[in-house]
């Protein structure tokens, strides 16, 4: 029978005439909805009930401090999560060693690169799945070797003696003990302005 009215316990946004519910303006919770047909034609009023539930949508943010991380780091890097718990972690592209449950990352077991970490909360209670993201970077450990051809050098040599360097560039040169005339940027050694002796260049 049509023509009845709808009502519910407090907190549910419901149209009394149509029974239409607006979840966005309702408070999360479980409600009893009553449809009542007034007494008429000598018949008593009739009512029927049903239950509806409004769930709170999941929400979360994630972040990692200290990125980029060098691949030499063997201790776990932990995630900071704010919001809904119970989600799972993943990363794109492949190559990042990450715990799907805790979100912890182990740089030393990861391939160098930049990754998007995803924290996914599954769809539930009529609400869509929620995904929070963060970006992390793993950098390759610098590797280099150096050598000087022709050493030992006679102290009478006035021309600079160049270094042969392989691997990562951009470093600075130094020596010990003191007494070696070396260019910190290029690694060039000048024997004539150096003190005779044996030096370690690094």
What are these regions (language model features)?
Residues 3-22, 90-106, 174-190:
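Low-complexity "stalk/linker" and mucin-like segments enriched in Ser/Thr/Pro/Ala/Gly
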Residues 25-29, 109-113, 193-197:
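Surface-exposed, short loops/turns at beta-strand junctions within beta-sandwich domains
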Residues 1-3, 198-202:
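Short, intrinsically disordered, charge-balanced linker/junction segments flanking boundaries
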Residues 1-7, 50-90, 139-174:
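Solvent-exposed, low-complexity, repeat-rich "mucin-like" stalks and linkers
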Residues 10, 41, 85, 93-95, ...:
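Solvent-exposed strand-loop boundary residues in beta-sheet-rich modules
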Residues 46-51, 104, 130-135:
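Well-ordered beta-strand positions in beta-sheet-rich domains
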Residues 40-47, 124-131, 154:
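Short, exposed coil/turn segments at beta-strand boundaries within extracellular/luminal domains
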């Amino acid at each position: 029978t049509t023509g009845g009215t709808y009502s519910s316990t407090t907190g549910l946004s419901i149209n009394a005439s149509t029974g239409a519910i607006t979840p966005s303006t309702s408070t999360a919770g479980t409600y009893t909805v009553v449809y009542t047909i007034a007494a008429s034609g000598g018949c008593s009023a009739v009512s029927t009930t049903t239950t509806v539930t409004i769930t709170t949508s999941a929400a979360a943010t994630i972040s990692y401090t200290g990125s980029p991380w060098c691949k030499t780091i063997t201790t776990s890097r932990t995630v900071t999560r704010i919001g809904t718990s119970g989600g799972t972690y993943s990363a794109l592209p492949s190559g990042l060693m990450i715990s799907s449950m805790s979100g912890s990352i182990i740089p030393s077991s990861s391939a160098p690169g930049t990754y998007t970490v995803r924290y996914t909360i599954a769809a539930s209670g009529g609400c869509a799945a929620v995904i929070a993201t963060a970006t992390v970077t793993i950098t390759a450990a610098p590797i280099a070797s150096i050598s000087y051809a022709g050493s030992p050098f006679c102290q009478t040599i006035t021309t600079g003696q160049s270094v042969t360097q392989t691997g990562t560039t951009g470093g600075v040169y130094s020596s010990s003990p003191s007494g070696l005339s070396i260019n910190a940027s290029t690694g060039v050694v000048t024997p004539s302005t150096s003190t005779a002796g044996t030096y370690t260049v690094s």
